[in-house]
A protein has these predicted regions:
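Accessory DNA-binding and partner-docking regions appended to nucleic-acid-acting proteins
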Residues: 210-215, 264-266
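Hydrophobic residues on short alpha-helical segments
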Residues: 215-222
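A short, conserved structural fragment
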Residues: 250-262
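Short amphipathic alpha-helical interaction segments
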Residues: 236-250
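C-terminal non-catalytic scaffold/interaction domains in large multidomain proteins
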Residues: 222, 262-263
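Residues in the recognition helix of alpha-helical DNA-binding motifs
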Residues: 124, 245-248, 264-265
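Catalytic cores of DNA base-excision repair glycosylases
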Residues: 2-213, 226-240
């Protein structure tokens, strides 16, 4: 397929497979940031109700920055990867204190925000500001694998970037990326454009039996009440993963130990 045909196809598929999402209805930068951090490692169906609850409680950067981290973690609980909540909280504080409440719109400024890497910065530039910025993630890889790398073999993002540069709709980058994402999601459901082709592919580790599972259990337990280590161990039927999970949460600043009582960071 040549790039001209591909661009027309993406426009068609964008209309055919469009998915309504609250952060698409309102593309203010704060909403896009919240959605992008939530969508890291978490499926859209699980994110939408959490996003709506989060925005209802923390409607803007100022409200989020002024809230204790413990409130943010309580609302985040269930999404997993709780460090994302801490990054979001720190970002809100940074926007208020260092950016005078003005959300950065350029890549350099966005990359200074906690938890924002190249892909998240690119997503914010496209979705919030409608500025064409190249970024690649799983659904995007899926589409380009299917149409330009059908012969198999490992493909690096550096192989995809020139094609993305040639095919991105520079006048309507927001709609282009929405279309790519929605089409890629549909392709994956059909079992085509497999991400295993990517040189960057890493299979996500299973939650069951992992330290990550215990971290989530500790956070959920502490959303209800402060507890001693013995109380946590007894409640969670602690095994060898417990100590690693507990020390990791302390190191990440998600929980604290005050006079023998563990609690969510205020």
């Amino acid at each position: 397929m040549d790039t001209g045909e591909f661009k027309q196809l993406i426009d068609e598929k964008g209309h055919e497979f469009y998915r309504a999402m609250p952060w698409r209805e309102d593309t203010r930068p704060y909403y896009v940031l919240v959605s992008e951090l939530m969508l890291q490692q978490t499926q859209v169906g699980r994110v939408i109700p959490k996003f709506e609850a989060f925005i209802a409680r923390f409607p803007d950067e100022e409200t989020l920055a002024g809230a204790p981290l413990s409130d943010v973690l309580r609302l985040w609980s269930g999404l997993g990867y709780n460090r994302r909540a801490k990054f979001l909280h720190e970002t809100a504080k940074m926007i208020i204190t260092e950016y005078n409440g003005v959300f950065p719109s350029k890549k350099d400024g966005l990359l200074k925000l906690p938890g924002v890497g190249v892909n998240t910065a690119g997503a914010i530039m496209n979705y919030a500001y409608n500025q064409p910025a190249l970024f690649i993630e799983t659904n995007i890889r899926t589409v380009y694998f299917h149409h330009f790398f059908e012969n198999g073999g490992k493909v690096a993002d550096t192989d995809i970037l020139p094609l993305l540069e040639q095919t991105i709709d520079k006048e309507h980058p927001r709609e282009f990326y929405w279309a790519i994402m929605d089409y890629g999601t549909w392709l994956k459901k059909q079992g085509v454009g497999q991400i295993q082709q990517s040189r960057h592919y890493k299979k996500q580790s299973a939650l069951k039996g992992s330290v990550r599972e215990v971290r989530g259990q500790i956070i959920r337990s502490l959303t209800n009440a402060d507890k001693t280590e013995n109380e946590l161990r007894s409640e969670l039927l602690a095994d060898e993963r417990f100590s690693v999970a507990l020390s990791g949460l302390l190191k990440d600043g998600l929980i604290m130990n005050t006079k023998g009582l563990f609690h969510l960071t205020k």
